[in-house]
């Protein structure tokens, strides 16, 4: 990849930013959401922060908090639907609780934790969506989605929205896809994605879906099973998402993957590379996801594995813009980084 420009786009230096998603609207405006306001990777402070750019990422608005529940709001996705609505996704977590200090060193953590009584905390766990029909000025109350994944749902050409993900808070932790027929207002379970022999489906995480140019649906899955550990696995559907192939390796070490369909119908996968060289990579498919190219490096100057979750959009001039989060060397607060690049 030919890198044109790399910069930090977050604007709160004393806050940790995590797990963003970038999307491009039909009018050319760019939107980024992230889990903002944080103290660290796991903490009680997470909220959904929203920024926009009207100049292809050269400048970004100051972040606006569009959702902040009483516990930790984590990975955030954003999408503009075919009808022009904006959908933002997140999930809530109490994973910070074991780290609550017993010795008052982090009084703020305890104060945040105690914003609601113990009895109500478990009821706050969920996977959530908020929706805007006025371009992000006003937002709905949050409402539950059946599954969650970091980057949220995808728009299909038949008008449906497809959300590939995991039932985070149900007993079975099922992996599969949901669909919406009403522009994201309500969601129905469509189908499970089968488990490969020898795998536990509980070790599949962080899915993302795209519709290829030939109508095939592709889902990428973060894999923590022993076989192909820390690789991105792939599953396909040729019947609109009613049935799926068993997940299989595509030879890509790195995770999680975000899928983009380019104007020329190539598919692009963007993923974090959490071993040396620490950074973010992309690969191209020119055959609707059958095969993937060798990796192209988008960034390789990371200092640790606390980085990634890249998402990529194609700009009007066919250059590409990728946004991810990264904890830079010497700074305990992760930032949002952006690079503009071309396929050289």
Regions found by a protein language model. Give the residues of each.
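Asp-box/BNR beta-propeller blade signature and adjacent active/binding-site loops
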Residues: 1-344
């Amino acid at each position: 990849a030919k890198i044109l420009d790399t910069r930090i786009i977050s604007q709160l230096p004393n806050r940790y930013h995590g797990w963003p998603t970038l999307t491009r609207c039909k009018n050319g405006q760019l939107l980024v959401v992230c889990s903002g306001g944080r103290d660290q990777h796991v903490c009680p402070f997470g909220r959904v922060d929203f920024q926009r750019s009207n100049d292809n990422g050269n400048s970004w608005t100051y972040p606006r908090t569009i959702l902040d529940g009483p516990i930790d709001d984590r990975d955030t996705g954003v999408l503009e639907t075919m009808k022009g609505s904006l959908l933002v996704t997140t999930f809530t977590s109490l994973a910070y609780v074991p780290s609550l200090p017993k010795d008052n060193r982090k009084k703020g953590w305890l104060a945040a934790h105690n914003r609601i009584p113990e009895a109500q905390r478990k009821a706050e766990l969920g996977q959530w969506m908020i929706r805007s029909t006025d371009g992000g000025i006003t937002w709905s109350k949050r409402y539950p989605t059946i599954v969650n994944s970091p980057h949220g749902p995808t728009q299909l050409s038949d008008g449906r929205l497809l959300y590939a993900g995991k039932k985070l808070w149900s007993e079975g932790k099922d992996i599969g896809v949901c669909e919406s027929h009403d522009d994201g207002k309500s969601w129905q379970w469509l189908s499970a994605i089968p488990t490969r022999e020898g795998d536990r489906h509980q070790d599949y995480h962080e899915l993302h879906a795209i519709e290829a140019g030939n109508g095939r649906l592709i889902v990428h899955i973060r894999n923590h099973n022993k076989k192909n550990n820390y690789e991105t696995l792939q599953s396909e559907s040729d019947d609109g998402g009613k049935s799926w192939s068993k997940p299989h390796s595509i030879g890509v070490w790195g995770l999680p993957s975000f899928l983009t369909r380019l104007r020329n119908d190539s598919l692009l996968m963007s993923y974090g590379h959490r071993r040396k060289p620490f950074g973010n990579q992309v690969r191209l498919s020119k055959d609707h996801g059958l095969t993937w190219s060798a990796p192209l490096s988008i960034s390789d100057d990371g200092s640790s594995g606390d980085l990634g979750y890249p998402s990529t959009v194609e700009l009007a001039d066919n250059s590409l813009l990728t946004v991810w989060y990264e904890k830079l060397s010497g700074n305990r607060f992760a930032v949002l980084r952006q690079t503009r690049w071309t396929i050289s």
